């Protein structure tokens, strides 16, 4: 039996979270077309007759000097030191750029085994030729490259085979029925954050966080009170919406997702609160990221 840890790295919106959810068969990491939706290192667990793969979904790799981005980049670097294998995902719709150069430099310097995953092969009008040439120039061998579609589950079985080939014999780190090690509070707060991000202005993902105030199981139903914190007054108005339309929509969609994932009824009550410039507070950023 083989087992090991694999870090999923890549630029924002390359399909890292989609791959994690697809292979593990459950919604573990939130998904959004808006860059850097994932903030934390999210663990997903896949177990079959061959052994166990523990995936670590990391924040999107982005070169920036903002405090929040720097904190997320530290998460990426820390995850690399904990794994046996790096899965570097490239969206074949995008031309290789500065991030790819830096990412490959980090991977090579780590001396850790790696696979380069070219994602979204189900799409047309891609940059596959430019990317293939770029990887060749960087000395990446064909045996280290695999082409997949995480969303359509194309070649994901082959990917799992390649991952196991790079693992050694080892124990099951988690019981077979586990598909994540996240606490329920964190998972619920991430679901609410995902719904708040959807259909709202692009700057909001970087300016809001969710805090669970109350979480109780009452007669077989989840009772949840949660606060959505924003960094300035105008963002509060965007999330609440005209006559409370947006916050109502966020609550309804989050409630349905929570009920589906946890297979129980859910009573969810949301409140939007202002915490000025929270995304510049080192202590709070550290708590949210770690």
UniProtKB/Swiss-Prot annotation:
Membrane topology, from the record: Peripheral membrane protein
InterPro entries listed in its UniProt record: G_ERA_dom (IPR030388), GTP-bd (IPR006073), GTPase_Era-like (IPR005662), KH_dom-like_a/b (IPR015946), KH_dom_type_2 (IPR004044), KH_sf_prok-type (IPR009019), P-loop_NTPase (IPR027417), Small_GTP-bd (IPR005225)
Alphabetized UniProt keyword annotations: Cell inner membrane, Cell membrane, Cytoplasm, GTP-binding, Membrane, Nucleotide-binding, Ribosome biogenesis, RNA-binding, rRNA-binding
Binding-site list for GTP: 10-17, 57-61, 119-122
Record bears the keyword Membrane: yes
Coiled coil: none
Span of domain Era-type G: 2-169
Domain annotation KH type-2: ranges: 200-276
Positions of the UniProt region annotated as G5: 148-150
GO cellular component: cytosol; plasma membrane
A single BP term in Gene Ontology: ribosomal small subunit assembly
Annotated region described as G3, given as residue ranges: 57-60
Region feature (G2): 36-40
Region (G1) location: 10-17
Molecular function GO terms recorded: GTP binding; GTPase activity; ribosomal small subunit binding; small ribosomal subunit rRNA binding
Region of interest (G4), ranges: 119-122
A Pfam family annotated for this UniProt entry: KH_2
Listed transmembrane segments: none
Entry's localization field: Cytoplasm; Cell inner membrane
Record SUPFAM superfamilies: P-loop containing nucleoside triphosphate hydrolases, Prokaryotic type KH domain (KH-domain type II)
Family: Belongs to the TRAFAC class TrmE-Era-EngA-EngB-Septin-like GTPase superfamily. Era GTPase family.
SUBUNIT field: Monomer.
Job of this protein: An essential GTPase that binds both GDP and GTP, with rapid nucleotide exchange. Plays a role in 16S rRNA processing and 30S ribosomal subunit biogenesis and possibly also in cell cycle regulation and energy metabolism.
Protein name: GTPase Era
Species this chain originates from: Borreliella burgdorferi (strain ATCC 35210 / DSM 4680 / CIP 102532 / B31) (Borrelia burgdorferi)
Gene from which this protein is expressed: era
């Amino acid at each position: 039996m083989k087992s090991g840890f694999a870090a999923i790295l890549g630029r924002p919106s390359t399909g890292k979270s989609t791959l994690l959810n697809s292979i593990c068969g459950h919604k573990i990491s939130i998904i959004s077309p808006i860059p850097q939706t994932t903030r934390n290192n999210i663990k997903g667990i896949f177990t079959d007759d061959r052994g166990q793969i523990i995936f670590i979904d990391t924040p999107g790799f982005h070169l920036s000097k903002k405090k929040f981005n720097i904190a997320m980049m530290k998460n990426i670097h820390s995850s690399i030191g904990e794994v046996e294998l790096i899965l570097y995902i490239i969206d074949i719709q995008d031309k290789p750029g500065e991030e790819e150069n830096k990412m490959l430099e980090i991977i090579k310097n780590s001396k850790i085994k790696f696979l380069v995953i070219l994602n979204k092969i189900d799409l047309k009008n891609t940059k596959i030729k430019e990317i293939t040439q770029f990887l060749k120039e960087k000395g990446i061998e064909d045996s280290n490259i695999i082409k997949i579609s995480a969303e359509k589950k194309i070649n994901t079985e082959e990917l799992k085979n390649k991952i196991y080939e790079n693992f050694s014999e080892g124990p099951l780190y988690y019981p077979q029925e586990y598909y994540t090690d996240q606490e329920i509070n964190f998972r619920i707060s991430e679901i609410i954050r995902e719904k708040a991000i959807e259909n709202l202005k692009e700057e909001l993902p970087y300016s809001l966080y969710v805090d669970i105030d109350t979480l109780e199981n009452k007669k077989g139903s989840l009772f949840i009170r949660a606060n959505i914190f924003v960094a300035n007054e105008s963002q509060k108005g965007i999330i609440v919406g005209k006559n409370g339309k947006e916050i109502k929509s966020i609550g309804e969609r989050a409630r349905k997702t929570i009920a589906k994932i946890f297979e129980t009824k859910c009573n969810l009550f949301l409140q939007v609160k202002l915490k000025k410039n929270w995304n510049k507070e080192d202590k709070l950023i550290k708590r949210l990221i770690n």
